[in-house]
Curated annotation (Swiss-Prot):
It is an enzyme of class 1 (oxidoreductase). The active site is at residue 73. The gene is GPX3. It comes from Bos taurus (Bovine). This is Glutathione peroxidase 3. Keywords: Oxidoreductase, Peroxidase, Secreted, Selenocysteine, Signal. Homotetramer.
Length: 226
């Protein structure tokens, strides 16, 4: 009886949004599906200043880390860690791409022209400038989601069974494979095929170790195949 009462209380708190909705339900990462149809090279996006459309095939032969970002999130500090990751793994072929999105708690409210200034002077602040490419703000879930995010999400299972508190999520319709929050990450391999997907709270250091492990494993596979 006590166990049932506790479960009932936890459910009430969950529905009220007082505890993290995915607590105990998330995985730090998931491996993407085998036999994915198509590649990321079929897509592209406009840079944050709107001046250049970059086809993702420009990154052929590289590892691409896709990150949906926000300037007023509790995880915005990951920007600093992502800069360090880009610098450290760029010699090994990693390219980080950032995609501002306002669908999670309305935490990216500014215009494209305001985002870089926010990062520089507010959060993370202190003159911060990302050393990786940012693209125009857009949707990653819902009716108007960017098509390459549809491809990524369909290629990789979600890292959490639950979406979260509906009053903080701003899109429709909601689907099981949707991105859960800001700073979720997808890794695409040198052949344009998605490899891994990370939960938004997985540390950037853990992401780095997963990427390095995969790079080493792939190098062994390719050496054996020659």
């Amino acid at each position: 009886m006590a166990r049932l009462f506790r479960a009932s209380c936890l459910l009430s708190l969950l529905l009220a949004g007082f505890i993290p909705p995915s607590q105990g339900q998330e995985k730090s990462k998931t491996d993407c599906h085998a036999g994915v149809g198509g590649t990321i090279y079929e897509y592209g996006a406009l840079t944050i200043d709107g001046e250049e459309y970059i086809p993702f095939k420009q990154y052929a032969g590289k590892y691409i880390l896709f990150v949906n970002v926000a300037s007023y999130u509790g995880l915005t500090g990951q920007y600093v860690e992502l800069n360090a990751l880009q610098e450290e793994l760029e010699p090994f072929g990693l390219v980080i791409l950032g995609f501002p999105c306002n669908q999670f708690g309305k935490q990216e409210p500014g215009e494209n022209s305001e985002i870089l200034a926010t990062l520089k002077y507010v959060r993370p602040g202190g003159g911060f400038t990302p050393n990786f490419q940012l693209f125009e703000k857009g949707d990653v879930n819902g009716e108007k989601e960017q098509k390459f995010y549809t491809f990524l999400k369909n290629s990789c299972p979600p890292t959490s069974e639950l979406l979260g508190s509906p009053d903080r999520l701003f899109w429709e319709p909601m689907k099981v494979h949707d991105i859960r929050w800001n700073f979720e990450k997808f890794l695409v391999g040198p052949d344009g095929i998605p490899i891994m997907r990370w939960y938004h709270r997985t540390t950037v250091n853990s992401v780095k170790m997963d990427i390095l492990t995969y790079m080493r494993r792939r190098a062994v596979w390719e050496a054996k195949g020659k």
